[in-house]
Structures are given as structure tokens and as C-alpha cells.
Amino acid sequence: MEEFQGYLEFDGARQHNFLYPFFFRESIYVLAYDHGLNRLNRNRSIFLENAGYDTKYSSLIVKRLIFRIYEQNHLIISTNDFSQNPFFGHTNHFYYQTISALFAVIVEIPFSLRLVSSFGGKQLAKSYNLQSIHSIFPFLEDKLSHLNYVLDVLIPYPIHLEILVQTLRYRVKDASSLHLLRFCLYEYWNWKNFYTQKKSILNTKFFLFLYNCHVCEYESIFFFLRKRSSHLRSTSSGVLFERIFFYRKIEHLLKVFVNNFQDILGLFKDPFIHYVRYHGKCILAAKDTPLLMNKWKYYFVNLWQWHFSVWFQWQKVHINKLSKDNLDFLGYLSSLRLNPLVVRSQMLENSFLIDNVRKEFDTKIPICSIIGSFAKEKFCNVLGYPISKSTWMDSSDSDILDRFVRICRNLSHYHSGSSKKKNLYRIKYILRLSCVKTLARKHKSTVRAFLKRLGSVLLEEFLTGEEQVLSLIFSRGYSPSQRFYRVRIWYLDIIYLNDLVNHE
């Protein structure tokens, strides 16, 4: 937020949430330019003057863009203008790409200001551990053992761009900016290009913001239904069509229900409900009966279809019983394992046995999916038999070894929370043997002869990093290599999924 304060003065626009005037400020373009350079140089910024000045900001191009926005009549532009008319050496493709880049930066301003003001000047505590993907698994270990059902939901994408604009309208009260956004979406992108274009980092950021607004709108309604679930019935879905004054309508609805329909209320409020969203999916875990879980499934489907006008199939919502079904969650197959226990109890002179069952959170590695990813990347065949990586044979030996070691350590790091390490051993075996076959093929040697010459060096490279990490976790009184294979380890520094893990 400090970078916004350095470029802008918010007092006028902040009061009315006007975003449109920001499109005419050169400082905003400088801010968008800085964001473009901070993307690891994976693409050139659209505000650069020419290819010979990769770090030079062009004020002339910015002035021309501002003039074009100011003079443009968005109501009379045709599709032919979009594809043919040049603009100072640039096409309208460049013009709309710039608008999307600016909108991605400008629209963050009111949300950031709202977040800062909500803390009342207090310093926001930073917890980097909560940013880790693994931080959710200790929570599930503690909570899922008391629950029995999980709804696995695939969040649908909006099938029409107008739905995204309408969703943003609930949070941005600036009609001019929304009209400009709607115009750019319809003129620059068709539906297919909007969802598949990933070459431009700025457009991807722009899409992610619209999608997150769409999901936040859905979650705000869902959480409201969750809190009021003891009063709301499926017959009341008609009042949810309009988001404006939503809470006022729902409060009025509750008063009517309480006063006039007290005898027919369906009370099914359950405090043991947990919600997690990840990678376009969400799970709803609860301690409910199958009937109540089907009710929640019914609410999900109707919320998307009738409120968001998105076609949502029943097959996209799965009801999993944790004691029987596996939940495919963030690269793990999670379930509840029932461990029978026999306890001997003695009372005075009589002794008897008590049969008990303990629930444990079980996490397994989806080995079939990972082998499929390995086969796609040519580390092994479809049966899991290691093969040489022919596309890497032009690299140096140290580079090839470093690539295999890095992949092996990343996967071992991520799947260290597995309950059983057998599948983890298989992953390491495939990568190590694939590495040996790649190097042996490069040097036109057999695997046996190559291992006799450099086998100890390869084994040391693969094991050194893992032993160093484990030695920091366990005390000296234990053997890290032995403890590692008996317990689950959750690392709090993992902020993204490896492509081989994210097989979807």
C-alpha cells in the first residue's frame, strides 16, 4: 500500500470510489510499468518505447494513450477498427491490452485502502507459516477426525463475461470504469481467448482479479447461508437474485419466518462445518447425515444456477464418506483410517475387554497420477519403468544431475507428510534410475558400467540435501533416517505445487 501512496493522492476519488479519473494520471502508468518489471522479466512491459531500451519508460507513449482514452467514443467503435486501425504505430490490440493492464492495477486501490482502514492504523502481523500449502494439513488432522462427510465441489467458471462485470459492480460503484471494462472485454477478447490466453502476464493478473471477485461473491453468500442455515430453506432462494441490499432482505426474511412460520422451520444448524478452497475447487467437511449433506449439495447447485446464472451439473459435487472414500486434495489422497483398539479394564476382582475404534487422518501419495505425470514428461513409461530423458542429453553432466536432484528433493519435500513412505521410495527410484540412464546414454555406456564408475557420487548428491534438512528437525538422540520413515512431516515453507504434483 505504501507504493500507492507514493504515486497518488486519494482524497477526492477515495470518497466516492471513483476509478475512472485514474486512467488519466501518468503516475498510474508508472506504477503499472513497475509491476511489469517485477515479473522476473518473463515478458517485456507494454510501456517500453522500443526494443533497444528494455528498461526505459516512455512518457510519450503514455501521453498518447491518455489522449486516445480521452478522445475515444466507445459507443461507435466497430470490430473493423479493432483489428485494422493503427494507433501511433500501435494497433488497437495494444490499446486494449494497456487498458486491461491499468485496470488490474487501479482496481486494487480501493480494496487496499479498505483493508488498511479496517485495521485502524494497527500493524498487520505477518505469519509466513500460514502461507504454506502444508499449513492446512495439521488443521485437517485435528478437525477431520471428528467429522464423517466431505463435499468435494468443482467451482464453475462463469460462461459469460457479463457475469464477471456484474459481480464487480457490487464492489466498485463507478459506472464509467465498469462501462470501459465491459467494452474492452467484448472488443478485445472472445470467450475462448479470455480463458486460454496465458502469454501476457498482465492479462493473466487481470483475469485472476475478476475470477477472485466472482469467487468472493459466491463465498460471501455461502457463508451467510451457513450462519443462517437454521432458518433458510430452499424455497427462499428467489430473494437471492439481487445482491444489492442483500443483508437487509435476508434479515427481513428471517423476521417473517420467525414470526409467521415458526412451526415449519427446518432446523439443521451444525457448528462442525469447515470450508477450504484451493485450485478452483472447494471442500465442505461436516459431521452430518447423508440427508443433510445432500441438502448442502442442493444449495450449491441452485446457488450457482439461479443466482450466478451458471450451468452447474450435479456430478461436479461429490459426497465422500471419509471412512470409505479417498479425498484427492492438494496432491494427497486423504481419508480417515479406523484403527481398532482393545483396552483391558479391571474393576475390583473382575476384568473385561473393551473394543474401541480410533480415527486417524491418513494421507497417501497418488502414485498412479504421479506416474502419469512422469510418463508425460518422459521420465518413465506408463507402467512406471524409468527411461532416459532424451531432451536433456545436450546439457552438461552437472546440469542434468542438478535438475534430477532438484526435482527429487522438491517432491520428497512436498510428500514428506505421507503416512506410508513406500510410494515415496518408488518416486525416488524412478528419478534416480532415469538420471543414471540419461547420463549413461549420453556417454554411450551401459547403466551397470556407469554406476560402477560414478554410483557413489550420484547417491551422495541425491541424499545430502535430505539428510541436512532432517538433521535440523530431529534432535541428536534420534536417527533422522529412521524417524523420517515413521512420522509425517509438514513443512511450512511450501507456497506452490510442483507441476508434477499438480497433475490436474
Curated annotation (Swiss-Prot):
One of its GO terms (cellular component) is chloroplast. The keyword Hydrolase does not apply. GO terms for molecular function: RNA binding. It comes from the Eukaryota. It is found in: Plastid, Chloroplast. The keyword Signal does not apply. One of its GO terms (biological process) is mRNA processing. InterPro entries: Domain_X (IPR024937), Maturase_MatK (IPR002866), Maturase_MatK_N (IPR024942). Keywords: Chloroplast, mRNA processing, Plastid, RNA-binding, tRNA processing. Belongs to the intron maturase 2 family. MatK subfamily. Usually encoded in the trnK tRNA gene intron. Probably assists in splicing its own and other chloroplast group II introns. This is Maturase K. The lineage of its organism: Eukaryota, Viridiplantae, Streptophyta, Embryophyta, Tracheophyta. The gene is matK.
